């Protein structure tokens, strides 16, 4: 993968897309070989990556901002400013005090994305970021991803909703049974 490019990871259910993202993010170990991010082992590059799981990894008993504060500690971030900015970028009010357990699925999905981007990662790994979000939120997320790509962030995204990304992503990678079987330019991608 090249820096600053937007890749869509495709394949049928069970092809290994989510597993590959989890391996890159350091959550699963590869059965053989190693994963390098910017020339260093992936587990040493965790501070350069943002990861959004298909099922939001959040604490239901905390507010949205409290969730982000918890994860910000892992990155040595003590200021609320980048956390509030990330929440606003995904269309959530950082002052909302409601517990995440009371959020809709779409709000949880957007908060999970805010958790993945508040530290401005160089590599963003997203597993189905458009699931459970309404059409307006999906467009807002697509615009956010376009802005991040323009700022040099490399994006690797798993989705079955290709239409939304046809003019945004640069390239698709097709997996089958855990193997890369095809790759190519996305329809509408600029060369």
Located regions from the model:
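The feature captures the beta-strand-to-loop junction immediately N-terminal to the Walker
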Residues: 10-12
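Helix-to-loop junction immediately C-terminal to a conserved catalytic motif
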Residues: 25
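Conserved ABC transporter NBD signature motif
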Residues: 33-45
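Conserved ABC ATPase "signature" region
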Residues: 69, 80-95
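Catalytic Walker B motif of ABC-type/P-loop ATPase nucleotide-binding domains
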Residues: 124-127
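H-loop/switch region of ABC-family ATPase nucleotide-binding domains
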Residues: 159-160
